[in-house]
Amino acid sequence: MANSPQAKKRARQNERRFAINKARRSRIRTHLRTVEEAIASGDQAAATAALKAAQPEMMRGVTKGVMHKNTAARKMSRLSSRVKALGA
């Protein structure tokens, strides 16, 4: 257990950051799930709209340190290619 005042403060800050990051990760996953569902339904218009909504959310996660930038880029690339394939 944390003994020094500094360690106690860091523990409090870690709890707070964990809650914020957890909410942010959850919001990103929700957006990704809506894109996946739109792709599964075969509706390109809905999938494109969901992808446009998910992209800034993922980039915000990268900026805030919740997700690595290469992971976000890979997910966006794969999703956009799948959405594009719906129209072909």
Curated annotation (Swiss-Prot):
GO biological process: translation
Protein biosynthesis as UniProt keyword: no
A GO CC term assigned to this protein in UniProt: small ribosomal subunit
Pfam family, one: Ribosomal_S20p
Molecular-function annotations in GO: small ribosomal subunit rRNA binding; structural constituent of ribosome
Region entry Disordered, spans: 1-25, 61-88
Keyword entries, A-Z: Ribonucleoprotein, Ribosomal protein, RNA-binding, rRNA-binding
Superkingdom, taxonomy of origin: Bacteria
Similarity section: Belongs to the bacterial ribosomal protein bS20 family.
Role noted for this protein: Binds directly to 16S ribosomal RNA.
Name by which UniProt lists this protein: Small ribosomal subunit protein bS20
Gene: rpsT
